[in-house]
Amino acid sequence: MALDDPDAAIALLERMLAACPIEATCLPGFLSMLRAQAAFATAGPRCVVSKVNYMGDGGGIVCRLDFGLGEGKPAPVVSITHLLFDGDHPLSDDIAAYQKHRITRLREQSA
């Protein structure tokens, strides 16, 4: 069973690339894991998605994050499913629909 509709995922990816940078909030589980790394110990939940890529059906849409911690810090890359996007962003409904669909498919696949 495919997790994504590749055409829909790539269409969303292209719209997100055109809209970058996009403000987002890290979900608590991801933020805790990130803060366990010394380079991100002071990272707040708010970040900026500076770039997006599609990693195929297995990886989905991934986002490169900027926490504004200064030059020389690594830029973490995370699945879009670990982020929340502001509801007033023009792509928020499309992003939320993609996230919901992907999470549902991942749960079905692991059941």
Where are these regions (language model features)?
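Basic/aromatic-rich interaction segments and small domains that mediate binding to polyanionic partners
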Residues: 1-14, 18-21, 28-110
